């Protein structure tokens, strides 16, 4: 069994036994046609591991805190689906250039208080970013949550994430590529 297969098996086991807030049951996985429609709407492919989570485990409803968002349809908790949220964030960034949303950065899980876990679909390792806009400063709103989606999932499985009570004071590393990826310039003072 490969490392990814072992990880997917562990995630599937926990997904069957732990419900995030707002989810009463684990949804069925998406089919290949749904994944293709999502990728067409986004304009880029999902990283293979993220695609496998949706294709093999469930259409959201598992993972830390509120769990993964569904790919195309709204979940029972009322959060928008991943594709819907990404497209809305990109549009909002065009309307408000002080808050640009990076291309290819897909929100996959809502933390509450407008915070999201996002996968950088352009990075080879599928870096997971934390979007935390409550500082009211775009340069202080993006952090590296985990260097890869694999690591982010392992941290959830191990119960060692920053969002756990025992780790809530953990420092986050700012995402250095934010300005490069948004091609935004600092507002004039």
Annotate each PLM feature.
Residues 1-115, 170-171, 180-189:
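A surface-exposed partner-binding patch
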Residues 68, 81, 134-138, 145-148, ...:
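Short, surface-exposed, polar/charged, turn-prone segments marking secondary-structure boundaries
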Residues 117-151:
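Segments surrounding the PLD/"HKD" phosphodiesterase catalytic module and close analogs
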Residues 143-178:
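A short, charged
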């Amino acid at each position: 069994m490969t490392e990814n297969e072992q990880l997917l098996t562990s995630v599937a086991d926990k997904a069957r036994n732990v419900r995030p807030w707002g989810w009463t049951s684990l949804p069925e996985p998406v089919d290949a046609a749904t994944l293709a429609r999502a990728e067409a709407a986004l304009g880029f492919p999902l990283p293979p591991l993220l695609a496998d989570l949706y294709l093999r485990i469930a259409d959201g409803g598992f993972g830390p805190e509120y769990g993964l968002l569904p790919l195309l349809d709204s979940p029972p908790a009322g959060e928008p689906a991943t594709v819907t949220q990404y497209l809305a964030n990109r549009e909002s960034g065009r309307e408000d250039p002080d808050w640009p949303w990076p291309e290819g950065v897909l929100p996959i899980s809502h933390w509450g208080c407008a915070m999201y876990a996002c996968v950088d679909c352009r990075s080879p390792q599928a870096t997971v970013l934390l979007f935390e806009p409550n500082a009211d400063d775009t340069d202080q709103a993006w952090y590296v949550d985990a260097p890869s989606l694999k690591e982010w999932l392992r941290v959830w499985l191990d119960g060692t994430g920053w969002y756990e009570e025992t780790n809530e004071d953990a420092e986050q590393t700012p995402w250095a590529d934010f300005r490069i990826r948004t091609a935004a310039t600092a507002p004039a003072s």
